[in-house]
Amino acid sequence: MKFLWAALVVTLLAGCRADVEEEVKLGQEPDRWQAKQPWEQALGRFWEYLRWVQTLSNKVKEELLNSQVTEELKLLIEETMKEVKAYKEELEKQVGPIAQETQARLSKELQAAQARLESDMEDVRTRLAQYRSEAQAALGQNTDDLQGRLASHLRKLRKRLLRDAEDLQKRLAVYQAGTHEAAERGVSAIHERLGPLMMEGPLQAIPPSQQLRERAEAWGQKVRGRLESVGSQARDRLDDMRDQMEELKAKVEEQASQVRLQAEAFQTRLKSWFEPLVQDMQRQWASLVEKVQSTLGISPSTKPSKTK
């Protein structure tokens, strides 16, 4: 049994060490959101605020007990989503006509990525609001367990936030490239119509190749999206399993502590029950011995003398 507990502790410590190493790596990631597009800068401010919250310093713990943190996060979320929408509209204005099917597909993928990022940011705010309610309910008690669960959930949410932010960044790049490519195809079509008749034959072969390329790109995007979705689900499940192991360990330790306290209380209760009974039996036995000795005429303090 001790060996199993030792193996479990080693496994959990190894997981914690991996979390610390990954924490350092993720802490360096926000640099990519600096001094670029306005939406990336807004996301960078949200990220920096989240990293400050994760320190769980005394100042953070104090401010988490009121609604100031969640209100500021709400403003940062609204600012980020506003900048994303503005950037998308700017891209649409900069380019010419695009194939309706391609535009619908790219726009749908972009909206889904934007929705995932917004959901991640809202999850952070919701989790902090939940912690505030739990901490206020446990005011005056030990909140180490609440802080441990909050830190674990924030690590998980931050990894998901980074992953979906990178996905949105890629989708915007694909959207920009797709619209620019459509504009270039429009220029090529004008050259085709105004070109000499002798070039008409070769130019007519271009549209089918472009259609094939569009289909290949669409198929590639679909496959890549599915692979990313599967990978994301696998990472989320691993994170869930790790969180469940941590919660299970905490519950087992708590139950073991309760069992130990109950056993000690039961032992004390048994002692309080039987100790008076034993003392009473000792008194009764001593009294019985005295009565027997008195009846036989034997003094309890002297031995009977031998008669000659």
Swiss-Prot record:
Keyword match Coiled coil: no
Sequence repeat placement: 75-96, 97-118, 119-140, 141-162, 163-184, 185-206, 207-224, 225-246
Region of interest (8 X 22 AA approximate tandem repeats), ranges: 75-246
Residue ranges of coiled coil: none
Subcellular location: Secreted; Secreted, Extracellular space; Secreted, Extracellular space, Extracellular matrix; Extracellular vesicle
Residue positions binding heparin: L157, R158, K159, R160, G220, Q221, K222, V223, R224, G225, R226, L227
Record-level GO BP terms: acylglycerol homeostasis; cholesterol efflux; cholesterol metabolic process; lipoprotein metabolic process; melanosome organization; phospholipid efflux
Name by which UniProt lists this protein: Apolipoprotein E
Naturally occurring in which organism (per UniProt): Pteropus pselaphon (Bonin flying fox)
